[in-house]
Every structure is written in structure tokens, then in C-alpha cells.
């Protein structure tokens, strides 16, 4: 099984994803680590990625996931078509949607320095977000341990 922890930047994908992978004893994969240099440069310049930027990245992630038996992937996966591309050819993918309101996420982003995701891109991420229909939905205003415990319980069902 692959668990994809998804949501906008600042929702806690990496933090919760790493903790979940530790809890389950699964491999953790951060999608951000697999962006090509051109994507990183574009985001660092405050420009949102478009589909042409994303497809090769999503294809790379899909290839990595196909090699895994059990893994947690932290990935924005904002649109349904991106999620479809990620899951293509994989037997079981569970989506974990980290949901938080704009003000909460903005305050989190203001407190951190992401290597290439300026907080100015948050509005474009919320605008692009297509919440998944079938997902484990987690309210990220709860603490990390509570979020991880809730996700682990749902994945065990």
C-alpha cells in the first residue's frame, strides 16, 4: 500500500508523513526531493508550476512508487488529474488529505523558511486545490501525534 499525504504547502505533509512512516515502519518519500532543477528555480522565483512542469515530476514519482511495497509519499497532489497520474498502475493508494484553513496555513508558512516555496504561492495553491472525494481527511489544527494516530487507525481498516 502507498499512502499519499497531500495538501497545500504548510499543511504539514513532510512532518506528518515522516511521523506516519516511522509509526508504520514504512519508507518515507518527499516529492519535493524529486523536482527537477528547473521546477525548483521557477518556484524559488515565486512562479507557480504549470502542468507542463508537473507531468515529468509526477511520472518520476509514479515510477518510484511502483517500486515500493509500503511507503508514505508527501506530495501536494492538488488536482484530481495529478492524483490519477501518481496512482497509475499501482494496486492500492490511500489518499490522506491534510486540511487546514487559509489563515492557519499562512501563519505556519510565516514561521518557516521552505527551501523554495515562498508563502506568496499559497493563494495559488488554495485556488488550484481540488479536494479528493475518497480520502482520509485530517484536520491539521490538531497536534502531530493525534493526526498520525488517526491516519494509522484509518489505514489499518
Where are these regions (language model features)?
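Small-molecule kinase domains that catalyze NTP-dependent phosphoryl transfer to phosphate-bearing small molecules
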Residues: 111-150
Amino acid at each position: 500500500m502507498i499512502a499519499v499525504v497531500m495538501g497545500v504547502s504548510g499543511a504539514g505533509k513532510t512532518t506528518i508523513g515522516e511521523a506516519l512512516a516511522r509509526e508504520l515502519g514504512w519508507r518515507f518519500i518527499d516529492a519535493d526531493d524529486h523536482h527537477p532543477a528547473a521546477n525548483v528555480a521557477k518556484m524559488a522565483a515565486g512562479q507557480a508550476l504549470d502542468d507542463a512542469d508537473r507531468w515529468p515530476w509526477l511520472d518520476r514519482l509514479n515510477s518510484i512508487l511502483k517500486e515500493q511495497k509500503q511507503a508514505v509519499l508527501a506530495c501536494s497532489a492538488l488536482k484530481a488529474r495529478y492524483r490519477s497520474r501518481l496512482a497509475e498502475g499501482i494496486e492500492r493508494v490511500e489518499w490522506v488529505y491534510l486540511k487546514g484553513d487559509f489563515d492557519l496555513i499562512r501563519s505556519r508558512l510565516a514561521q518557516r523558511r521552505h527551501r523554495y516555496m515562498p508563502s506568496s504561492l499559497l493563494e495559488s495553491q488554495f485556488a488550484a486545490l481540488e479536494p479528493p472525494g475518497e480520502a482520509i481527511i485530517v484536520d491539521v489544527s490538531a497536534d502531530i501525534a493525534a493526526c498520525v494516530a488517526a491516519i494509522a487507525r484509518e489505514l489499518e481498516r
